Amino acid sequence: MNLITDIIIAVAGVGVGVAAGYVIRKNIAEAAIGSAEAQAKKIIDEATKAAEAKKREAVLEAKEEILKMKNEVEREHRERRQELQRLERRLLSKEETLDRKIESFERKEEQLAKKEQEIENLRQSLEETLQKELAELERISGLSTEEARELLLKQVEEEVQQEMALLIKEIETKAKEEAEKRAREIITLAIQRCAADHAAETTVTVVALPNDEMKGRIIGREGRNIRTFESLTGVDLIIDDTPEAVILSGFDPIRREIARRALEKLIQDGRIHPARIEEMVERATKEVEQDIREAGEQAAFEVNVHGLHPEIIKLLGRLKFRTSYGQNILKHSIEVAHLAGLMAAELGADVALAKRAGLLHDIGKAVDHEVEGSHVEIGVELAKKYREHPEVLHAIATHHGDEEPKTVEAVLVQAADAISAARPGARRETLEAYLKRLEKLEGIANEFEGVEKSYAIQAGRELRILVKPEKIDDLASVRLAREIAKKIEEEVEYPGQIKVTVIRETRAVDYAK
């Protein structure tokens, strides 16, 4: 019973406690809500006041900005209005000026029309007067208008030709002076730095004997030794009354050299019979081939030309045994290479190319007696075969003037070839060829109309021409000299240059009686 009572009391106590707690909490919550509402109201009031202040400031700023923009717009408007007023005034001024100019042009146009009419009237008057004068001139002179025009044109043409001849002479004189001066300087420098000797042309070789008894041993029994020797070498062995000497004769200098060496070895050995002759000729042939190769290599080394084909080097070596008008062709080629290289250096051209072309320019002469064609054509084919540079081919093809040189190096090779050939002592020609050249020079000059006589003097290096003064005047003599020189260049082969001098002499003779 007490337990139940205690439980009831406890439950009642808890209920009273809960009710009391609820009441207390409600009071506290209501007090807190009242305080929060007061605080919120205070914040709202402050925010409202701040917003009102910001609003007033924004309105003031907006009004100021609007006022500022309004003032700016009004200022721009005033400026534009003023600018438009200025433009309007300028436009009015230009319109007034244009009106005045139009009026002036109209007045000038009227004046021009009057002048044109006056000129037309004057032209018609002059035309009528001219026709009358022409008719009168035709009546007086007996010439028609066309005849008078032709006569006038002929006179003008003669005057122009005279002036042209004088101008050409003046230009040629100046050009020759400048060209000769520069060429003389270049050639002098090149020649001073290049020295070369020359060899005399010959078709025989003399071999000395220790005694005349050796002649019989060379001939052999019934001449078998001499027949064997000649058949193996292709050279004639001449044994005559010349004491202690025999003569080897042949146009091929390489064969002649092989024969000389073989014969000297046979003489030194003393054993001369067909088998020994064959052995010595074979040995001499190998020696000469070795000499040819060494001569070609030495020539290329001397002029500092590299990269030559071995066959080209052999062909160069063969030139050691060839001559032209007494001049050794290999030495001539080396000399041309040196001269072309020196002149190329002076002119700023390709020195290596000039030397290479100069060294190979006569390469065709190594086999021209074995292959058909000129040495120029053969040289071009050989150089092309062994893959030489196209400009080297061009220089070889043009060095005798068969083609027009198109490169500086080709011109230099042509000039160096002429210089080397014309050098005193470098070449000699047969009397027959010399006389034919002189006759050819005089014959060319005598072919021209107005030539009275011609003389080739100074060993064919100058041609003097006497003309008929009644047919050739002073200006025509200038043209005649140039035409004769051009024809000589086309038809005559000669070393160096030939001076063509035209002499016109007028004599007046009378007798006192």
UniProtKB/Swiss-Prot annotation:
SMART domains: HDc, KH. One of its GO terms (biological process) is mRNA catabolic process. Residues 329-422 form the HD domain. The keyword Membrane applies. The chain crosses the membrane at residues 4-24. Residues 203-266 form the KH domain. It is a single-pass membrane protein. Keywords: Cell membrane, Endonuclease, Hydrolase, Membrane, Nuclease, RNA-binding, Transmembrane, Transmembrane helix. Endoribonuclease that initiates mRNA decay. Belongs to the RNase Y family. This is Ribonuclease Y. It comes from Carboxydothermus hydrogenoformans (strain ATCC BAA-161 / DSM 6008 / Z-2901).
